[in-house]
Structure formats: structure tokens, C-alpha cells
């Protein structure tokens, strides 16, 4: 009987075990690469969502800041951009005086609407005097800050999508148009 198998070519049990081990190592490497790529994809997707939401809010603030109308040389109540908490130069609320008249004349100059941005709960609210809406509905806002220096409005928005440890902060600055009529 030994004579039958003596010259036959075949695969030994040791070779089969080695092949199985090599295949399992390759499978583990490929699966760990897949898991890492999925984790990277999910993290990147969350950052993109936060970025889009914050970008929309910042553009909204910028657009209305550029429409602000007021007198920076008079009392603070006529300034185009107002931070209601005057004791603190940085605040979570921003009021913008908008004149919707077209064209703006000396007779309708003082007819203004106040647009407000403020943090309420976990969102950034825009109030146009008639309705209120959340500017960032898809993400959780953890911090909002507005600071007014001489002729600039600066601030930041901090938000996260699903994991508070992965919060992102977006900074912005606006230089509203200044005009003086004598």
C-alpha cells in the first residue's frame, strides 16, 4: 500500500494549514483596512455636514451685517450692529438694524427692522422680527460668540453632529459698510 502513495504528488496537511493561515492573515488585513476606511468616511461625513451648516449660518450673518444701517458716531442705540450685553464685549446675541426701504432717503432712514441672531438651547436662532428659525437644524450648537471692535464684527460658532468630542469651531469676521452723511 505504501508503494501506491510513494511517488504521488499531493498536498500535505502542514501545507494546507499554512495556506489557511496565510489566507486568514490576508483576510484580517483587508477587513481592518475596510473598517478603518469606513471610520474615516463617517468622520469626514460628519465634518462636512457641520461645515455646510456653519457655512450657511455664517453667510447668513455676513449678508445681513453688510445690509446693516446705523450711525456709529451717535448713541449705541443707533449703531447698525448691536451686541445687547454691553457689559461684556463678547456675547451670544447679535442685533442688526436693517432698513428695507429702497431707496433709503432721509425721510425713511430711521425706519428699521431689527434682525437678531442668538443661541437658544442647542441651535442658532435667526429672528427677523416676524418669525424665528433655526439656522443650523442638523447639528448641535455648543457655543456662539459675537464680538464687535471698531469697525469689525468677529465671532465663532462651535457645533457637532453626533459626537460632542468631535466638535468643530468656525471663525468669521465681517467689515460692514460704513457711511457718513453730513
What are these regions (language model features)?
Residues 16, 111, 168:
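Exposed loop/turn and edge beta-strand positions of beta-sandwich/beta-sheet ligand-binding modules
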Residues 1, 61, 84, 107, ...:
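Compositionally biased, intrinsically disordered low-complexity segments
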Residues 72-150:
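Type IV pilin-like appendage domain
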Residues 132-182:
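Short linear sequence signals and composition-biased patches located at protein termini or domain-edge surfaces
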Amino acid at each position: 500500500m505504501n508503494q501506491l502513495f510513494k511517488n504521488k504528488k499531493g498536498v500535505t496537511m502542514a501545507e494546507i494549514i499554512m495556506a489557511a493561515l496565510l489566507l486568514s492573515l490576508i483576510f484580517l488585513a483587508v477587513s481592518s483596512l475596510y473598517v478603518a476606511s469606513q471610520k474615516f468616511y463617517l468622520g469626514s461625513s460628519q465634518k462636512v455636514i457641520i461645515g455646510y451648516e456653519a457655512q450657511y449660518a455664517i453667510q447668513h450673518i455676513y449678508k445681513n451685517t453688510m445690509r446693516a444701517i446705523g450711525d456709529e458716531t451717535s448713541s449705541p442705540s443707533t449703531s447698525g450692529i448691536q451686541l445687547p450685553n454691553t457689559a461684556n464685549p463678547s456675547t451670544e446675541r447679535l442685533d442688526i438694524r436693517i432698513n428695507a426701504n429702497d431707496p433709503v432717503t432721509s425721510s425713511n432712514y430711521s425706519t428699521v427692522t431689527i434682525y437678531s441672531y442668538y443661541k437658544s438651547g442647542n441651535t442658532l436662532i435667526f429672528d427677523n422680527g416676524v418669525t424665528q428659525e433655526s439656522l443650523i437644524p442638523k447639528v448641535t450648537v455648543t457655543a456662539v460668540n459675537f464680538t464687535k471692535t471698531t469697525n469689525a464684527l468677529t465671532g465663532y460658532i462651535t457645533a457637532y453632529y453626533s459626537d460632542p468630542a468631535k466638535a468643530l469651531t468656525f471663525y468669521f469676521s465681517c467689515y460692514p459698510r460704513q457711511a457718513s452723511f453730513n
